[in-house]
Amino acid sequence: VVGCATDIRVVLHDGREISGNVILSDEESDLAVLKLDTDEILPHLELRKSDTVEVGELVLAIGNPFGVGQTVTNGIISGLARTGIASGSAKGYFLQTDAPINPGNSGGALIDISGSLVGVNTSILSRSGGSNGIGFAIPADLVGQFLTQAKAGYSGFIRPWAGMRGQPITFEMA
């Protein structure tokens, strides 16, 4: 969402605009951390552990689809740990939701009914370009790792990696 922006302004729920700058961004993860030019302590969401999220849970997707203003839609978690299927620049594993997500929702919160952050909306699979019930969010655990690295002053996001890759076993290999 921030890309190469030089003039960053965040619009709060009450309509106030606050200027800020990018502390850390990563196009591959489709995430950015902003530092806002204010001394005010702003409300924030608690990050929910991704391993506690279950298929069928109710969620709310918050965003600014098509620039129409702040919008909230609802749905459920449709799938966990989806890989290789999200459109756009984001790569990794995702939560799948049927909450309507459209262009402009990227970077918005996906929250549970308790108000905890489950994920950050990132992309959709759609032939029409609009929502058809297949949306994806970056899990809160990855968001938390990104925030931790931003607070530590990292200049780029270092992704978790196990250093191995799985593959199906063929008859010849066995």
Language model features: what each stretch is:
Residues 1-174:
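Serine-dependent protease modules
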